[in-house]
């Protein structure tokens, strides 16, 4: 109880101090507040991961009833992920926002929102009362909206924020529907009532209830086709907010899915198929669109959708394993999902911070205008490269570890599987392989175009490397990216407690085949270190051998062409042209070009602009139809005050009469039933 009180006290003190502090101190107060609350919540989380769950009962009110605060191993795992990303984001943001210190009021609002987002995320993981959960979820949505619209004077930023806010409240509507459904039947808002409700109901009702919650959490996590807010919100927000949104805010949707799987008794095979299919589609579609983006942050945003798909594949496999009694499939699926949740929060937040460095140095996110930054920003380029290798799932970095577990789970699922499951697994395996291949294509494009070659567009100022304030949080994330890849044993041990919550449904203990898979990962570290030492020795020998010999630096051979320009380099579009031509039937790509007609043309033009086909189908077209329908009632808005007063009178009359009419109808039905 003392920790809960201290947590709330830190939150309120920060909210009071930030508006009145000097502009230089606002960021320091924000960092201090999130650091203190990180320390408090980590104490509880570490105890829970050690097997000591924490339960506190808060008094609540007449409406909410008693409010249970329960931190089990699943909550603890997500709390630790949230805390690390929030801390690195706070330190990076302090440096990033120095350029905006003339906007004191804006910085105050931003600092308050950042502290609130952190508190709301921790509360969502800890609260086990549906009304309190919804309040925390709403605080998270509103505070995230404020963080996104930091540059509210830009029309595209404001539009992205409003889009996020609308879709967040659609998510909340589905959450309310699910929670109210249970509360009306069980007369309780405690999460234990959800389990009690599912025990009493047939599987069809439970499946429907879980689907309602899944839609809500799919929207927050960004599964296709509920992903359409992500490509707008991530590029619009400041870099540290983009890192936090991709690293942990969308992961709260993953937490919700896992929590409901624990609470609701269900047909795990059916729900596993649903999650798996949505996840494969999300992963493939996300990386397909990421590969053809021109905006660096939008490219990273679509990769968030791709990685949410990878996490979902692990969850889907785990559910199918529970349903079929395949303990190995279940163990490796859930283990891969839990570990990839951490891994993605690390490399994606670091990538967004690197994108922030690029933006502050060049004032553009257009990949087609960039190039040659490795000469000006070598540290940022190195960090981006390592993070890109990690997100592509290459050893010896963290992305490889979690994806290896998911691949191993798929292969284990074929043993003794019926024909339907075999086809589903083949489909999933093909999808995961395609995701990995396209991710490599995408990030070779991104790194090569942004950091190699020469600048493709004149810069108003010479780009410079970011300072230590920006680089230190990135190095912190990078250390874990490398650490998990080389020493996976310690991090696999950390997920054992949350993993046990799921696999205990089949029986106690980790199966031997899964243990062998975990042990196989231990060989990666020594192999990687051996390769690194060998490469260092070769580099040292080469350097010593050439140290005393004369050196000359010349331009790359240009096939005897003596007047090269930066326009002759590969662009981001031309690099992926072959892929783009193959994928055009599945993607919505607008092409603008000016045909060359003269023998000696002065100029030519060819542009490609990718659009989200899923957004067109599932958002734009339905909204146009809804707008057409609503416009049929535009005559109601006629501008006459007298008519508006009549509307009010009619509405109040209906509110007063409906209960009476309802009671009479019920009485009439009961009368006829008696006959």
Where are these regions (language model features)?
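Transmembrane helix-loop-helix hairpins at membrane boundaries of multipass inner-membrane proteins
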Residues: 2-3, 13-112, 188-198, 497, ...
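Membrane-helix interface motif
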Residues: 46-56, 180-191, 317-323, 396-412, ...
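Alpha-helical transmembrane segments and their helix-start/interface "positive-inside/aromatic belt" motifs
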Residues: 24-35, 160-169, 297, 301, ...
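Aromatic-capped, Gly/Pro-kinked transmembrane alpha-helices
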Residues: 490-529, 541-675
């Amino acid at each position: 109880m003392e920790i809960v009180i201290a947590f709330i006290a830190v939150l309120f003190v920060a909210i009071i101090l930030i508006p009145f502090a000097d502009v230089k101190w606002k960021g320091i107060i924000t960092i201090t507040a999130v650091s203190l609350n990180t320390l408090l919540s980590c104490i509880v989380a570490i105890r829970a991961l050690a097997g000591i769950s924490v339960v506190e009962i808060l008094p609540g009110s007449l409406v909410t009833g008693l409010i249970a605060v329960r931190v089990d191993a699943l909550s603890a795992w997500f709390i630790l992920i949230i805390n690390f990303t929030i801390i690195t984001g706070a330190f990076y943001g302090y440096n990033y926002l120095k350029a905006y210190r003339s906007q004191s009021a804006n910085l105050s609002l931003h600092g308050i929102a950042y502290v609130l987002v952190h508190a709301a995320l921790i509360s969502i993981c800890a609260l086990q009362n549906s009304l309190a959960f919804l309040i925390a979820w709403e605080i998270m949505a509103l505070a995230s909206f404020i963080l996104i619209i930091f540059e509210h004077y830009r029309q595209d930023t404001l539009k992205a924020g409003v889009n996020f806010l609308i879709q967040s409240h659609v998510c909340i509507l589905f959450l309310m529907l699910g929670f109210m459904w249970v509360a009306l039947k069980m007369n309780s808002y405690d999460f234990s009532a959800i389990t009690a409700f599912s025990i009493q109901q047939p599987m069809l009702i439970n499946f429907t209830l879980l689907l309602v919650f899944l839609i809500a959490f799919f929207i927050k996590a960004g599964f296709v086709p509920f992903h359409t807010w992500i490509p707008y919100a991530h590029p619009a927000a400041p870099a540290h907010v983009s890192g936090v949104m991709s690293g942990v805010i969308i992961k709260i949707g993953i937490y919700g899915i896992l929590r409901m799987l624990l609470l609701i008794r269900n047909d795990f095979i059916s729900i596993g198929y649903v999650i798996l299919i949505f996840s494969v589609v999300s992963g493939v579609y996300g990386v397909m669109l990421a590969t053809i983006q021109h905006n660096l942050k939008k490219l990273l945003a679509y990769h968030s959708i791709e990685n949410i798909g990878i996490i979902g594949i692990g969850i889907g496999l785990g559910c199918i394993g529970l349903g079929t009694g395949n303990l190995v499939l279940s163990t490796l699926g859930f283990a891969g999902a839990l570990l990839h949740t951490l891994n993605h929060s690390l490399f994606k937040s670091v990538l967004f911070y690197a994108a922030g460095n690029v933006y502050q140095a060049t004032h553009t996110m257009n990949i087609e205008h960039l190039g040659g930054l490795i000469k000006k920003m070598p540290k940022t380029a190195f960090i981006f490269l390592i993070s890109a290798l990690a997100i592509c799932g290459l050893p010896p970095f963290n992305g490889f570890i979690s994806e290896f577990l998911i691949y191993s789970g798929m292969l284990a699922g074929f043993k003794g599987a019926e024909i339907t499951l075999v086809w589903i697994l083949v489909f999933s395996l093909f999808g995961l392989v395609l995701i990995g291949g396209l991710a490599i294509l995408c990030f070779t494009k991104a790194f090569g175009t942004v950091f190699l070659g020469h600048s493709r567009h004149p810069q108003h100022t010479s780009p410079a490397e970011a300072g230590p304030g920006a680089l230190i949080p990135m190095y912190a994330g990078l250390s874990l990216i490398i650490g998990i890849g080389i020493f996976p044993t310690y991090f696999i041990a950390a997920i054992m407690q949350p993993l046990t919550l799921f696999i205990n449904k089949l029986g106690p203990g980790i199966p031997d085949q899964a243990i062998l898979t975990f042990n196989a990962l231990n060989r990666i570290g020594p192999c990687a270190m051996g390769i690194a030492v060998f490469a260092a020795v070769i580099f040292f020998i080469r350097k010593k051998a050439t140290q005393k010999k004369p050196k000359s630096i010349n331009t790359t051979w240009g096939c005897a062409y003596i007047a090269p320009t930066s326009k002759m380099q590969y662009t981001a579009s031309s690099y992926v042209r072959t892929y783009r031509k193959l994928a055009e039937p599945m993607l919505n790509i607008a092409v603008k070009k000016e045909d060359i007609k003269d023998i000696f043309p002065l100029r030519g033009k060819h542009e490609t602009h990718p659009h989200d086909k899923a957004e067109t189908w599932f958002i734009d077209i339905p909204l146009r139809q809804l707008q057409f329908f609503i416009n049929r009632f535009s005559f109601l808005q006629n501008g006459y005050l007298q008519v508006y007063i009549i509307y009010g009178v009619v509405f109040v009359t209906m509110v007063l009469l409906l209960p009476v009419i309802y009671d009479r109808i019920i009485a009439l039905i009961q009368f006829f039933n008696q006959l």
